[in-house]
């Protein structure tokens, strides 16, 4: 689980990668998995200067339910000061109403992309 949250390098830039389905395992309790990942993620992101983190959240294969979204909501607020940009990939399985709820609660855009390379290019396009 520790390598589900890690910095990668893309075209010479550091990007914080969060893989919800790291290893391709489908969790029996998505909310518990997100809580565990949240600790790792917040530990990583809060060590960085404000406004500096490029974040790629990979939801490929993840199944989010209402409980998982409730766990995710405060994380989207707590990480905000540290982020320069964030992008989500693999969100096809997140119901639109839950995605819109996350955007509304966090008061930020959550750009979605079909593939990682697209998301990474967008993160660096600033």
Sequence positions of predicted segments:
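Amphipathic, Lys/Arg-enriched alpha-helical "gate/interface" segment within cytosolic domains
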Residues: 1-126
């Amino acid at each position: 689980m520790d390598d589900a949250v890690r910095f990668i390098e893309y075209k010479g830039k550091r990007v914080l990668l969060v893989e919800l389905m790291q290893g391709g395992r489908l969790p029996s309790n998505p909310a518990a998995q997100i809580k565990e990942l949240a600790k790792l993620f917040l530990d990583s992101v809060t060590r960085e200067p404000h406004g500096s983190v490029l974040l790629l959240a990979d939801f490929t294969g993840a199944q989010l339910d209402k409980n998982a979204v409730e766990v995710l909501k405060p994380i989207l607020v707590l990480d905000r000061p540290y982020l320069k940009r964030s992008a989500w990939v693999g969100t096809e399985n997140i119901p639109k109403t839950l995605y819109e709820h996350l955007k509304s609660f966090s008061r930020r855009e959550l750009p979605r992309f079909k593939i990682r390379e697209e998301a990474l290019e967008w993160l660096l396009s600033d």
